[in-house]
Design a protein with these regions (language model features):
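Glycoside hydrolase catalytic-domain context in secreted enzymes
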Residues: 1-176
């Protein structure tokens, strides 16, 4: 199926949905729509440094450590390896009818937030404070996750936390 055929098929499928059915698909945990042959799917899968939340997998260093390498090619290879493991797990879990959280191929990765304040508790999930480095490594990670095999994406990347994730949450950077 080519891109045009896929778009036409998706458009026709959505046109058959009720408003309630379409709205139900907007959550990370999308329920099945049996009358249309749509299985349940949970869009929430993470791949910042591997896919071990759904069982055994290779665990790579946190993003801050990967950022310290300044190595775009390395990050692309790591992400490609993560994508292969994610696809293999997805295929295995799907055969069992298990499409719950962390078992999909839609990856909420990479984190392209800029690490602005060392007091923020999730800085290790970022590539650091340099926007140019973050852009370069983030693109490489997406390219690796979205490596095509047999004409299809291995996984689909969703770069996260671009806008204001490290603030300004109330009281995030203060103490009593």
């Amino acid at each position: 199926m080519n891109r045009t055929e896929a778009r036409e098929k998706a458009t026709a499928l959505v046109a058959q949905m009720t408003i309630e059915e379409a709205a139900s698909q907007l959550l990370h945990s999308s329920p099945a729509i049996p009358r249309l042959g749509i299985p349940a799917y949970d869009w929430w899968s993470e791949a910042l440094h591997g896919v071990a939340r759904a069982g055994t997998a290779t665990c790579y260093p946190q993003a801050i450590g990967l950022g310290a390498t300044f190595d775009r090619e390395l990050l692309q290879k790591i992400a490609g390896s993560i994508a292969l493991e994610a696809r293999a797990k997805y295929n295995a879990y799907s055969r069992l009818g298990d499409r719950t959280r962390y078992k999909g191929v839609t990856m909420w990765s990479p984190n392209i937030n800029i690490f602005r304040d060392p007091r923020w508790g999730r800085g290790q999930e970022t590539y650091g404070e340099d926007p140019v480095l973050t852009a370069s490594l983030g693109c490489a990670f997406v390219e690796g996750l979205q490596t095509k095999r047999d004409g299809y994406l291995t996984t689909a990347a969703c770069a996260k936390h671009f806008a204001v994730h490290s603030g300004p949450e109330a009281l995030r950077h203060s103490f009593d």
